[in-house]
């Protein structure tokens, strides 16, 4: 072996192995599929192994490729840790940080916070994606998941960024037409706007009050996987919605929405979630603390407190 593989080629290979194709990786990196194919070919030539089986429909990793993938993952993690330790010494976070969040919260709250972070720490390179699904942080190469909801796997590290609750709400027009529910069981007979949240099963609202937890099955003619769509339907008087306080507090203050069954709520705190190997990462630690302070300063009424 005359040459050592380039770190960037190892990164490209890992992405291709995860995505099982060149086109998706090319789109993610902002390059052509031909460029991705060339980098893989050069890496195979350098290592003198076949890393991938290529067909017209998909790309699969070879047995040798699986071993190289494991080595590449360790090498890149070690390089990342080295850069983090340098950042600790310099007290300046630097390098790539891939962050993910949900659509609505990501667009409205997280994106402006990351813009402020980028201005404060220009040596950080931030990659921000939005997905309304739980991601596999390890296998999808995500450093930090900014998520809403308290159901977090025990093998992950979670740092609380802000207190938040989901509440039941509807428009004044809806209340005038259907009446306000007086008991939790009334929701079963009313049109509800159902959304697939990342942290709860579809069509089952798991709520709490002073007496403890409650679960209610709800239905309605309209449902979506996008919170902003459900929010707009709620404003349009199409049903009762279960939405985060950060999302509807201004509408409630303005009278465009009203809270129903106010004694019931759903805990949905905001967390920064990452894998254990990043516990000592300077850029993760500084980013988490920055976001915590940002939310406290820019969203002082983030939460609806419950006794």
UniProtKB/Swiss-Prot annotation:
Q: Effect of gene disruption?
A: Deletion of dmlR inhibits aerobic growth on D-malate and inhibits the induction of dmlA expression by D-malate and L- and meso-tartrate.
What function is annotated for this protein?
Transcriptional regulator required for the aerobic growth on D-malate as the sole carbon source. Induces the expression of dmlA in response to D-malate or L- or meso-tartrate. Negatively regulates its own expression.
Q: Does the keyword Heme apply?
A: no
Tell me which Gene3D superfamilies the record gives. Answer: 3.40.190.290, Winged helix-like DNA-binding domain superfamily/Winged helix DNA-binding domain
| InterPro entries recorded | LysR_subst-bd, Tscrpt_reg_HTH_LysR, WH-like_DNA-bd_sf, WH_DNA-bd_sf
Task: Fetch the Pfam families from UniProt.
Answer: HTH_1, LysR_substrate
Q: Report the DNA-binding ranges.
A: 22-41
Q: What induces it?
A: Expression of dmlR is subject to negative autoregulation under both aerobic and anaerobic growth conditions. Its level of expression is generally lower under anaerobic conditions than that under aerobic conditions.
Q: Which residues form the HTH lysR-type domain?
A: 5-62
Q: Which family does it belong to?
A: Belongs to the LysR transcriptional regulatory family.
- Name the species this protein comes from: Escherichia coli (strain K12)
Identification of the protein by name: HTH-type transcriptional regulator DmlR
User: Which keywords label this protein?
Assistant: Activator, DNA-binding, Repressor, Transcription, Transcription regulation
Out of the domains of life, which is the source? Bacteria
């Amino acid at each position: 072996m005359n040459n050592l593989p380039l770190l960037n080629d190892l990164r490209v290979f890992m992405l291709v192995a995860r995505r099982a194709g060149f086109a998706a990786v090319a789109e993610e990196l902002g390059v052509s599929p031909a460029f991705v194919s060339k980098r893989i070919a050069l890496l195979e030539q350098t290592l003198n192994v076949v890393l991938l089986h290529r067909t017209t429909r998909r790309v699969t990793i070879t047995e040798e490729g699986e071993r190289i993938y494991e080595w590449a993952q360790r090498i890149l993690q070690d390089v990342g840790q080295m850069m983090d330790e340098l950042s600790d010494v310099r007290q300046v976070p630097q390098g790539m940080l891939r962050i993910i969040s949900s659509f609505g919260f990501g667009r409205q709250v997280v994106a402006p916070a990351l813009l402020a972070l980028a201005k404060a720490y220009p040596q950080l390179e931030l990659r921000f994606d939005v997905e309304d699904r739980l991601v596999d942080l390890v296998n999808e190469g995500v450093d930090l998941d900014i998520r809403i909801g308290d159901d977090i796997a025990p093998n992950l590290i979670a740092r609380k960024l802000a207190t938040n609750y989901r509440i039941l709400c509807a428009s004044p027009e809806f209340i005038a037409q259907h009446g306000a529910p007086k008991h939790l069981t009334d929701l079963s007979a009313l049109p509800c706007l159902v959304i697939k949240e990342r942290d709860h099963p579809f069509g089952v609202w798991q709520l709490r009050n002073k007496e403890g937890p409650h679960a209610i099955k709800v239905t309605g003619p309209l449902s979506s996987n996008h919170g902003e769509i459900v929010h707009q339907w709620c404003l349009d008087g199409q049903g009762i919605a279960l939405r985060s306080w950060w999302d509807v507090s201004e509408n409630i203050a303005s009278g465009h929405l009203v809270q129903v069954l106010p004694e019931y709520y759903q805990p949905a705190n905001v967390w920064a979630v990452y894998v254990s190997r990043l516990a000592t990462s300077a850029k993760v630690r500084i980013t988490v603390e920055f976001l915590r302070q940002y939310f406290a300063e820019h969203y002082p009424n983030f939460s609806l407190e419950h006794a």
